[in-house]
């Protein structure tokens, strides 16, 4: 029985799921908006939001925890230098999920997941 088991399986084994969400979290931090399927976006939110909360307090231990989850120094630097200070006053809710129709090949529901309070230049670049 799967009573009280949280998280979606997404037809992947645990190592594949962990790697996928690590890569997706890195992409979201780097680009601040990505397009993916709706269930993946909803699960990604559970990975990215704690990372940003971690980045609000800059310490060596927190940087190491963030690196352990993303395996990317560039992403860790952006988390702690840009996103942590940007979201310092916000108590959670750092991401927004926008539904954007269905994929042509298999009718999978698609969504954009983005960081809220993005700078205007990033918003205009993403729109193009």
Swiss-Prot record:
A single Gene Ontology CC term: cytosolic large ribosomal subunit
Biological processes, Gene Ontology terms: translation
One Gene Ontology molecular-function label: structural constituent of ribosome
Entry keywords, A to Z: Ribonucleoprotein, Ribosomal protein
PROSITE patterns: RIBOSOMAL_L17 (PS01167)
Pfam families reported for this sequence: Ribosomal_L17
Subunit annotation: Part of the 50S ribosomal subunit. Contacts protein L32.
Family of this protein: Belongs to the bacterial ribosomal protein bL17 family.
Xref: NCBIfam families: L17
Protein name: Large ribosomal subunit protein bL17
Taxonomic source organism: Vibrio cholerae serotype O1 (strain ATCC 39315 / El Tor Inaba N16961)
